[in-house]
Amino acid sequence: MNAEHAPFRHYLDLADARLGSQVVAVSDEWFAPASRMLQAGEPVWKEGVFDDSGKWMDGWETRRKRFEGHDQAVIRLGVPGVLKGVDIDTRFFTGNHPPAASLDGCFCAEGDPDDSTSWSEVLAAVGLQGDSHHYHPIDDERPWTHLRLNIYPDGGIARLRLYGVPYRDWSNQPPGTALDLAAAVNGGRALACSDQHFGRMGNLLNPGRAINMGDGWETGRRRTPGHDWVIVALGHPGSIEAAVVDTLHFKGNYPESCSIQAAFVEGGNEARIEAQSLFWRELLPAQKLEMHQEHRFERHLNALGPITHVRLNIFPDGGVSRLRLFGRPQLP
């Protein structure tokens, strides 16, 4: 499966280290640490760079196995989630990639798995090629807190992407508590945008403030009439009380202004949501933006009641590092 036929890539990468995901157990990491698999950036090749263990590689690499068995790494997800698809990425590993890999999962209410933990198969063993993406859809609605990557028998993996939806038990949410309903860790998801030439739309919902311009959403320079936009599905329906539009790191390329439309969408097809969004109500009228600054809007918001989706419009183009939508979840 190639990238064009892997629609699950639009989901959040639950293995992203920026979410707090980390490797908690590993059988071997002689040549390169398993933590590199979880880095958000794309893997790179450094010609002629060696360290004390050998050739420097941007990923996880184990030593050559001289006995029975296989290598594995256990990842604790920063937020529990339901997987929609995975990418086992072996870019730059040629001659030292594993010929096969599989994934297991478990749900630990507390702590990390131990010898008594029961694991379930998430992805049966699949063949791997060197220097390649390996996309596989996952059809399983069970949430996981930990994933175990098995490689057979040894070798190197550049990146492990675990695309899915964060799992949250909203029934345990204290009444009246305001949350960032757009946050990726709360299930918020960027669905569509007019352009993401320089920075992916999903970055808007990442935790914390952006580390650089690349950690935000940025469009190409608009040379035709119109403006850019992005549509976000909230993690849970709710009434918005405050909106934050952050242009941190965007200085000569920030939007002149922005507005937000919103709606309570019931059913329908996500593929049609772009056209539907043209007629959504105005949550935030057009507001002027400044460079490299966090803009918080409260009194400017219109009281629309519970909503499920928003459309952030930026005029005419540019970059925004974060979008925050604080509100009270509409609980049963």
UniProtKB/Swiss-Prot annotation:
UniProt KW keywords: Hydrolase, Purine metabolism
Enzyme class of the recorded protein, top EC level: hydrolase
Catalysis: reaction(s): allantoate + H2O = (S)-ureidoglycolate + urea
Database matches in InterPro entries: Allantoicase, Allantoicase_dom, Galactose-bd-like_sf
Record GO biological process: allantoin catabolic process; purine nucleobase metabolic process
E.C. number(s) listed in UniProt: 3.5.3.4
UniProt GO MF annotations: allantoicase activity
SS bonds (residue pairs): none
Pathway recorded for this protein: Nitrogen metabolism; (S)-allantoin degradation; (S)-ureidoglycolate from allantoate (aminidohydrolase route): step 1/1
Pfam families: Allantoicase
Family note: Belongs to the allantoicase family.
Name of this chain's protein: Probable allantoicase
Organism placement in taxonomy: Bacteria, Pseudomonadati, Pseudomonadota, Gammaproteobacteria, Pseudomonadales
Encoding gene (name): alc
